């Protein structure tokens, strides 16, 4: 209300629109869980959005934590302008603003010759799907295991594609304008993704990039063929774009895999999960003996600790430099994706300038990458904490092997512990 009163007689500013959208995202809660995702694309010259997470923004404007912020490029900037934005990203220590290139999206959309690439494309909140205005993503996912053969992966890709094609028939949007239905049916987009890439000897690029490219090409062709077969059966359009790599911060936790195209955090580590004290699940886990403590930052929240072990041979964050991550990203962009691979690239200070030069040289190709500083330091109750094998074995004994799930919720307790947007705060950190 204060925002609208303050803007009486004039247009809303970009930061006012941004804050209003963030506030809307903040109140979309079901069952105590945030059910919104938000990306804010802003002009390169918009300094208000560029610096909207500077200072103590989480005190004065906590709603801003609900959005991932990216600058939207309509052309390759001159080097001084790029350098200003790159320097601002470094100084933020939060990976923002990210970089979304409309030119790169148009070039990628044109590659498969099944899509009209003249639109002013945008993207979904994690920036792996290339979207027209008034359009949805339609995601399904392959869980890659370290022992998967090419035949295994093709079978999984086929199943994920069939699921996505079935989902593409669900276009009865009763409360939206007709243009949403028109665009969704016309392009029938899929988003067949891979998670656990860094757990696999071939897909992680550890064996041979030539072999990797052949496998990815075969998998992509399997997806295209499966979509055509099932779209014909269902009487819908074949998909204008099928394959992507999403960050998979949540799915990877559920299935115990490396997330998307990212490396595992460490060989052995503690994974901490927060829960509202009002959440019945909190009482179940505490009663079962799962290690728990009060959240030092939030009196109404508990922190549960689970020890984790990466698969033998899995790539970890400490083993992979920024340039290795970017080179692998480019392979997936060229040989797997019809959309984009979404990736958080972790850089050390000595790599930052080299990464910036690589990014500028390939600017018209790059979209869907965020950048965060890699740190071996941990803070109290961090979501991830590396440990050694001895500590892992010791703490593993404290985790119960059986949990009694018969406790029932008797009250409506939907005011749960909310999570913020994935960049810099949830999926990968």
PLM segments and residue spans:
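Secondary-structure capping and boundary motifs in well-ordered enzyme cores
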Residues: 16-17, 128-135, 182-193, 215, ...
